[in-house]
Amino acid sequence: MSACAETGGVARVADTVRLRLRITGLVQGVGFRPEVARIAADHGVAGFVLNASGAVYCEFEGPGERVAAALARLRDAPPPLARIDAIDVETTAPQGDTTFAIRHSDDATTTSARTLVSPDIAICADCLRELFDPSDRRYLHPFITCTNCGPRYTVITDLPYDRPATTMADFAMCQACADEYADPADRRYHAQTIACPHCGPTLSWYGPGGGPPVAAAAAALSGGSIVAIKGIGGYHLACRADDDAAVATLRQRKSRPAKPFAVMTADIEGARRVAEVDAAAARSLRGPAAPIVLVPARAGTLSPLVAPGLRDVGVMVAYSPVHHLLFAALGPGALVMTSANQGGSPIVYRDGDLDWIDGLADAVLTHDRPIHVPCEDSVVAIDDDGAELPVRRSRGYAPLPVGLGGAAGNRPTVLAT
């Protein structure tokens, strides 16, 4: 067997060939295996793909030029959320395969290798459209997701990345979800967090008022209450960002007299109503990480207690289905969204800590999908060239490594503890 990194030699082979690929980088939790299966189908090659602890393994078998074309497409056009660091290629003996399969993950292969885990990804445009489409079976489903979006890092309990190794393990797929999961043409093909109203997690409301949980939370917020909301990486404390009394109460309860709060709006248009959002800031707000972005506040749109004495305010846009449903019920405006904790303490993320939250919030909007890894909202500033400057690197970026770039990119990786 000989290793190679190019496809030129393969393309000249007319007979059946088989290539064994080991692909490393950010290749788990980003729809990589389904995309490999689509590539194989499009190019008429057989074989398989599977997750292993340190990589994705794939074998392509077929006429040489078809195999070469499939490899070239995989390398040049991977899934948008993936990052390929290397593809190691070996030629191996053809096995006579006639189909291509996504195999069960192999946790016995390269168990000592390090695996890049995908960060949590903001809701994609397709899922957002379906969320508010009355004809869609996931209409208003607070946990809509697909291979292109949704929680990853915060729900993964083990590797390789498969549903049994996530906090979705206890939610058995209904037949409709199972059919989508098994359909190579579906956007949810092998989407590990797939769910729907029949088989997925559910919201719960603990507070005054009845009816649907989101509607009850919206009514409480509109009335000036402070509501704890379980999100992707932990609980937020939320209140109306234009309500001086609510913001003052929140500061008193959190023992946070002056440190600025971040605010959340439904979308970019809402962000521009409360802050000066230029094109670079908008790119960050709309990106898959959906961080808090520090931008100049617009006078008179927020309570002066949100960021007292400061020119800038931290703004983020709704990044989860629950957030979008909440803003749809609330209407235009902004919410303070701050971590549910006392000053200096870690974010609350375990449902067993709800009794402790009682001293901070008037009510709780929660759900039964466990959070395995807590994750705060990331914070970035924008420099004069429009590039992000990380202030706090967490949700949407963690646990990916930081690229040093330039000459530093050739230096050894160092883990500081």
Range-by-range predicted roles:
Residues 1-193, 197-204:
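Intrinsically disordered, low-complexity, mixed-charge
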Residues 106-417:
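Active-site-adjacent structural elements in enzyme catalytic cores
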